[in-house]
Amino acid sequence: MLIAAVAAFLVAVTVAASAAARPAAPGQASAGPTDVRAAFFTNWSRYARGYLVKQIPADKLNVLDYAFGAPTAAGTCGLTDPWSDYEAPTGADQSVDGVADDSANPNQHLYGNFNQLLKLKAAHPKVRVVMSLGGWTGSKYFSDVAATAASRQAFVASCVDLLLKGNLPSDPATIWPPSAGGPGAAAGVFDGIDIDWEYPGIDPGNGADHSPADVHNATLLLQEFRRQLDAYGASAGKHYLLTADLPAGNVNSSGSWELAQVSRTVDWINLLTFDFHGSWDAWTDFNSPFSLDPKSPPVPGALMSTWSTAGTVDYYLANGVSPDKLVVGVPFYGKEYVGVPGTNNGLFQPHGAPPSNDSPTYHDLVDTGLADANLTVIGPTAVSRTSNTGNDGKGLNGFARYYDGAAKAPWLYNPTLNGGTFISYVDPHAVADRARLVRQDKLRGLWAWEISNDDDAGDLTAALSAP
């Protein structure tokens, strides 16, 4: 979910909204939770960290986005990892309900994450599960499937068939367990579809097909999704959610999305309010600044008043998006730079070549001992940790924690590691700032990328509901 790669394509705009001038554009009434607390869960989490559906703190969420499905070269809806999605048997110790899958049972047709998601929903009936299509590597064929009325209709129909009706591919000769898949096997798993097209109309460097016609075709694609989801929902007796993930900053100024029309079509918009900065920049800065520090070096081509979480919200509201359609994104990961001099404790300084892992997760920082998660001051119902050192969020093992009051963003700096190591990240304090913004501006809620990146205690997820 990178937005920085599109920076060269940004076009400056002349509209910069102030908080006092925010319009509340009328939007289509939407269903689903009015106070969204969402997180993404990926089908590769089982490999990357051994993080399973059973570990998701569903009691702290009301929406779970599953990443990713994707459009295929054939113009249909596809799964990006069928083994993880619906084939991999789950043992009793890893199952949500403690019951193992039976790969020898010819009557069991659903395994993997999909089966565990059904069990998660049974245990937490308020949680809606939404399949996200696309992402950075899965957006290649969006331009093609959105190009004509016929291609849009066929693609959306295949998504309804695969994801909502649950008609999964099956072939005992090539799929194991041989009973996996088939008609209706995944019925009831998903309560909606999320579109993460990165990005219509431009070449962000991810190999995605693109055309100037994408900008309007993306709107038409969402409208076709809305039409078919509503039609199928009427027959099924429920409302299926439709959401879209849209970029931060002024990337939309001359369009990669028609904001007001999209707002009226979807239930809500997930704002990609992160990756404002990273190792692609010539200097260190914050991955997800809450607001703009005036000392932040300008990004070429960017309207800097939009280059923060609060600035992005202002921009969307000024361009016709209703507040109740905006869900603010929170990254559960940071950005790391090395070869950073000690001036200003590493902030806004030049850096060396990117490290092998330039996006450490909050789990990496806390559970491996670089940052302390004992935070006690975010409010009367604060996140409180007693198992760590008790030093209220300070850096550990050579790192010191600093805080930029203008950007409302923390960072870690170690002057001796790798010639000076700077890590921008989000902690529960920063999540609480975003929760207050949501309440202040009457926005729809918060969402996180992604749940397995949280620390073992789930501190960031808990902070999504901070006072």
Language model features with spans:
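Substrate-binding cleft/loops of secretory-pathway carbohydrate-active enzymes
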Residues: A48-Y51, T243-W283, G334-H351
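Active-site cleft segment of glycoside hydrolase catalytic domains centered on the general acid/base Glu
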Residues: K140-V262, W280
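Secretory targeting and sorting signals
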Residues: M1-A24
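Solvent-exposed loop/turn segments at secondary-structure junctions
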Residues: N43-Y47, F68-A73, G135-K140, W197-P204, ...
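Glycan-binding loop/region signatures in secreted carbohydrate-active enzymes
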Residues: T72-D101, H277-P298, V330-L437
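Glycan-recognition patch characteristic of GH18 chitinases/ENGases
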Residues: A31-P177, A213, W307, N357, ...
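Aromatic- and acid-rich polysaccharide-binding/catalytic face
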Residues: K60-N62, Y66-A73, D81, A186, ...
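Conserved, mostly hydrophobic/aromatic
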Residues: L64, M131, I195, F225, ...
